[in-house]
Amino acid sequence: DFLNFYLKRLEPNGIGMLSLDMPGIGYAEHWPLVQDTSRLHQAVLHYLSEVAWVDHQRIAMVGFRLAGNVAARLAFIEPFKLKTVVCVGAGVNQVFTNQELFAKCPRMMRDSLANRLGADAAQWDGMRTKCQVFSLKTQGLLGTRTSVPILSIGHKRDFICPEQDVRALAAASRNGKAIVFDKQPLLEVYDKALDEIVEWLKQHLCT
């Protein structure tokens, strides 16, 4: 999906892409998922400033779901290294702090989180307690403001990123924008979200 996104949407607009695995999966499986969810990506962000052929004044980060948590976190703690951030359906607060929303997590998501945390997926109450630290509001970030413009995209019926979180994320940034979809089919919404992402990146990176 990300290769197609790059080839069909980013490359034609002169935008490069570097894709990173989240801690606990893929090539980053030896990195445990901890409260500092962004430490791996932050290290890469610092490294890019030393790469001669990368314009470190025009770096953006796009994150989907839990990766949106990482992108949003870096918008707050690395405002001078990011030109803009895009978060899509990002789990940033309520899914980790609201017991009813956390209980909606499907089994596959529970197993994935447990694996990254080194926890037992069957011990759901313990899992919920451990995951509360991933809330950017609990961390004291969401509720402050960042100078990095954030495009926050979500769906009205998404339990991982409720509309309130979508709008709170955009409101916490300078010239941020919230887009909340409310229609089916999801594939159509997904394509529209990709269109919005590209236009946002062009606006902030190519002008």
Where are these regions (language model features)?
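Catalytic active-site module of serine/aspartate enzymes centered on a nucleophile-bearing elbow/loop
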Residues: 182-183, 187-207
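Short beta-strand/loop motif that positions the catalytic acidic residue
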Residues: 145-146, 152-154
